[in-house]
């Protein structure tokens, strides 16, 4: 794919789109610095390129350059304030920075725009748990499960929340459902073993 975009750029270097899509290809290959260069060129050619700002923010985030990511998300929101994904992405960066209240607010904005974003429910559940809003976190997990009954992440996170409140039987039930969706999930296998241990059901470990 990168070679194809190289050829297009060689012939039509004045177009912003080939730089943007080559940036996406580099982002998928974990070449974050290369992606940033291409997104920056796309923005130079088209200063109102919303998606270039948003994905450059993602690349900055992956390089742990959170201030740069936040600046790009802010610019993207100024250009397109009704896009759910840019709020969800900014929430991820805010959570990494430890600003859980801001992250919760952005996940909520994303879900107001698009109420079917499973990842936003799960990410909001994580920050709500950190903000000691156990009931809110549980509600978000349940909303995610309603949208995707085969989400091992949703069942696994809800199982963890049950475990935190010593609701061991409910935790086991959710971990079992998570493992039914993905039997190879080692993290959930270990979590279930911890619950069995707490319940003194040692043979199950």
What are these regions (language model features)?
Residues 1-205:
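Alpha-helical tetratricopeptide repeat
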């Amino acid at each position: 794919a990168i070679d194809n975009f190289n050829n297009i750029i060689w012939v039509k270097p004045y177009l912003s789109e080939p730089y943007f899509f080559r940036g996406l290809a580099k982002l998928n290959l974990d070449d974050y610095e290369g992606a940033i260069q291409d997104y920056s060129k796309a923005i130079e050619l088209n200063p109102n390129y919303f998606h270039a700002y948003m994905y450059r923010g993602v690349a900055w985030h992956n390089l742990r350059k959170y201030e740069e990511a936040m600046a790009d998300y802010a610019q993207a929101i100024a250009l397109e304030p009704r896009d759910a994904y840019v709020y969800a992405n900014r929430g991820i960066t805010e959570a990494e920075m430890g600003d859980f209240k801001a992250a919760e607010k952005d996940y909520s904005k994303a879900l107001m725009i698009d109420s079917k974003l499973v990842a936003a429910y799960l990410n909001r559940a994580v920050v709500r748990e950190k903000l000691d809003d156990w009931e809110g976190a549980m509600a978000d997990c349940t909303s995610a499960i309603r949208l995707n009954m085969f989400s091992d992440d949703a069942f696994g996170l809800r199982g963890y929340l049950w475990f935190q409140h010593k609701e061991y039987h409910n935790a086991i039930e959710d971990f079992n459902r998570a493992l039914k969706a993905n039997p190879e999930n080692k993290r959930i296998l270990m979590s279930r073993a911890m619950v069995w241990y707490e319940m003194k059901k040692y043979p199950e470990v």
